[in-house]
């Protein structure tokens, strides 16, 4: 028996009414991070916390002055990452990764991770896009 | 003897009823079978994979109600604005309450039997054991709780869940969406032919709202997903981060 096509045609909106979801699943992304400008950090993974409510991994990277900064990169919860194909084994201490991320508003060395580029060049998303439109320098 | 138009009408009604039966799964007692893993949104329902590809869907056959602003009484509106996202109960891993729990970007499983419906939520390890009770009768010894007390009945093909007995510590949806212990929520779960559930929740709270407020969501089955552990407090640095911001 056919699905009533007539009903589909009458419906213009896409349906997700509860769309104002907390983007990091647990807390307000916009309140904590600069959601409209991405930074890119390349460095060595020093620690991985595959934990709830968010994963954290830590990356040593040099700043413009040549000083090493240990960035704390926050991501989605472990279950969410696993379901998108980002597993715990993807983050290995000692690997050099490039992370595009949003900086914390409090100027600390915390980041909301977006896209991670692994040593083999593959890329996966660790967290959500922050702004309404995808930043042009995301790649 | 029936006339031809009447006969056609009867055939059409009969066909439509067969069509309805054929397009949604039903339990042995003929009720829509809501059992399974569902989610109200978030992370593009797990299509936001390595290449950033997001899942896309056809327009739903039965969209949920459009959400309107919460109709607060003036004092409540003013009080609502005193809160920030750092005050969010869920930031401290506390139960999200109803209807907010449905909007959390994590899956939940509905387990349906003829006598009760159980909803096991991944978010905050919430659960609801909902007796099916045509009189929607709640226990008479309720004390206020985060998730309230739920009872359900079938209204045609919709499962109607009546929820009361709430504390006043949860938020209805966004920042500062307060309510009182007088909160009363009536939810409807309607299984659709496109394998979605149209969820709506009508919220009344005469001490706080000027009239009823309705919200909703379209629930989908996230692919290859089972409800798993979410021990929110494990490494919850967010309170500290947000309080620094406040």
Show which residues each predicted segment covers.
Chain B
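Bacterial N-terminal signal peptides that target proteins for export
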Residues: 1-14
């Amino acid at each position: 028996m056919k699905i009533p096509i007539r009903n589909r045609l009458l419906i213009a909106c896409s349906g997700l009414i509860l769309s104002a979801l907390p983007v990091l699943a647990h807390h307000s992304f916009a309140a904590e991070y600069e959601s409209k400008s991405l930074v890119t950090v390349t460095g060595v993974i020093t620690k991985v916390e595959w934990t709830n409510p968010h994963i954290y991994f830590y990356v040593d990277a040099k700043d413009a002055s040549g000083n090493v900064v240990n960035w704390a990169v926050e991501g989605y919860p472990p279950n969410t990452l696993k379901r998108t194909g980002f597993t715990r084994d993807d983050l290995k201490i000692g690997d050099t990764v490039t992370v595009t991320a949003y900086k914390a508003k409090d100027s600390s060395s915390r980041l909301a991770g977006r896209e991670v580029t692994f040593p083999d060049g593959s890329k996966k998303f660790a967290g959500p896009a922050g702004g309404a439109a995808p930043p042009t320098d995301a790649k | 003897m029936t006339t031809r138009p009447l006969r056609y009408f009867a055939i059409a009604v009969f066909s439509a009823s067969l069509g309805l039966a054929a397009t949604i799964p039903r339990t042995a007692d003929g009720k829509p079978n809501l059992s399974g893993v569902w989610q109200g949104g978030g992370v593009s329902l797990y299509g936001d994979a390595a290449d950033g590809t997001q899942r896309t869907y056809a327009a739903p056959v039965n969209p949920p109600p459009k959400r309107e602003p919460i109709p607060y009484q003036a004092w409540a509106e003013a009080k609502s604005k005193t809160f920030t996202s750092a005050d969010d109960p869920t930031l401290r891993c506390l139960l999200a309450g109803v209807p907010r729990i449905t909007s959390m970007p994590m899956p939940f499983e509905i387990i349906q039997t003829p006598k009760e419906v159980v909803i096991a939520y991944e978010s905050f390890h919430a659960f609801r054991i909902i007796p099916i009770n045509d009189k929607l009768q709640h226990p008479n010894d309720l004390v206020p709780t985060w998730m309230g007390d739920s009872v359900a009945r079938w209204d045609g093909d919709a499962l109607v869940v009546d929820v009361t007995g709430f504390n006043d510590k949860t938020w209805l949806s966004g920042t500062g969406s307060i309510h009182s212990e007088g909160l009363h929520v009536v939810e409807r779960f309607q299984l659709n032919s496109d394998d979605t559930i149209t969820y709506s929740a009508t919220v009344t709270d005469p001490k706080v709202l000027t009239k009823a407020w309705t919200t909703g969501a379209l629930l989908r089955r996230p692919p290859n997903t089972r409800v798993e552990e979410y021990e929110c407090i494990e490494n919850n640095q967010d309170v500290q981060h947000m309080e620094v911001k406040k």
